[in-house]
Amino acid sequence: MRFKELIFPLRVEEEEIVEKFYEEGFFNFAIEEDEKGKRVLKIYLREGEPLPDFLKDWEIVDEKITTPKDWIVELEPFEIVEGVFVDPTEKINRRDAIVIKLSPGVAFGTGLHPTTRMSVFFLKKYLKEGNTVLDVGCGTGILAIAAKKLGASQVVAVDVDEQAVEVAEENVRKNDVDVLVKWSDLLSEVEGTFDIVVSNILAEIHVKLLEDVNRVTHRDSMLILSGIVDKKEDMVKRKASEHGWNVLERKQEREWVTLVMKRS
């Protein structure tokens, strides 16, 4: 599949543009540094797909036709947390570490973003052998794959974006792990209960998730909620408290916060 890559100078705060994309239901983007160290926004449009309305007045600094394979060439293997590597190139072959093979496609979440790193950090810290895990808003599937390789007995990964589901399914096959990936609008298609629910999405969507999360958890379950901008942390905490969840641990990188929660 061919895409048009458009590059814009980043004129607003990162969290502001991420929120805007999620509001518009647009997921094919990345925020990176260019060769001069300046933050830029990259978006990827399928053939014939229009430019999102809120970007029509933005200056385009570069434009080219590209494919997912082109993006993988630009990525190198890296250690996302101690002992866990992400490898978009399939260059790593080691038995003393967990290696996640990744074809990013155009779904958000290669492991480079702080919210993904913090999520994997807490999965590694709290996941026990044999736990069941639900990944809500799975994107590339990186958290679901990490959970399975860290010892989860059952992993379900869901996303509302059909292309994210396709990318996650491809990555699950690439890693040869048993993870069920399916479409779901938050928990609409999810059945059963899980020991850990991990979700790397926006604060406003966490608030909606918390309305129904008790249905898919039990008394000893744990929530790992990431993708929260620090100024909206209290909003998530209040909603969690309303439904019987308290913060067990908190981690922050730049303006991004990840919360680990248990039932009160």
Curated annotation (Swiss-Prot):
Native source organism of the sequence: Thermotoga petrophila (strain ATCC BAA-488 / DSM 13995 / JCM 10881 / RKU-1)
CDD domains assigned to the protein according to its UniProt record, in alphabetical order: AdoMet_MTases
E.C. designation(s): 2.1.1.-
Annotated localization: Cytoplasm
Alphabetical list of InterPro entries matching this protein: Ribosomal_L11_MeTrfase_PrmA, Ribosomal_PrmA_MeTrfase, SAM-dependent_MTases_sf
Name the UniProt record assigns to this protein: Ribosomal protein L11 methyltransferase
Keywords: Cytoplasm, Methyltransferase, S-adenosyl-L-methionine, Transferase
A Pfam family it matches: PrmA
Binding site for S-adenosyl-L-methionine: 116, 137, 159, 200
PANTHER family: ELECTRON TRANSFER FLAVOPROTEIN BETA SUBUNIT LYSINE METHYLTRANSFERASE
Role noted for this protein: Methylates ribosomal protein L11.
Family affiliation: Belongs to the methyltransferase superfamily. PrmA family.
Reactions the enzyme catalyzes: L-lysyl-[protein] + 3 S-adenosyl-L-methionine = N(6),N(6),N(6)-trimethyl-L-lysyl-[protein] + 3 S-adenosyl-L-homocysteine + 3 H(+)
Principal subcellular localisation of the protein: cytoplasm
Gene3D superfamilies: Vaccinia Virus protein VP39
GO biological process: methylation
Gene Ontology molecular function: protein-lysine N-methyltransferase activity
Cellular component, GO annotation: cytoplasm
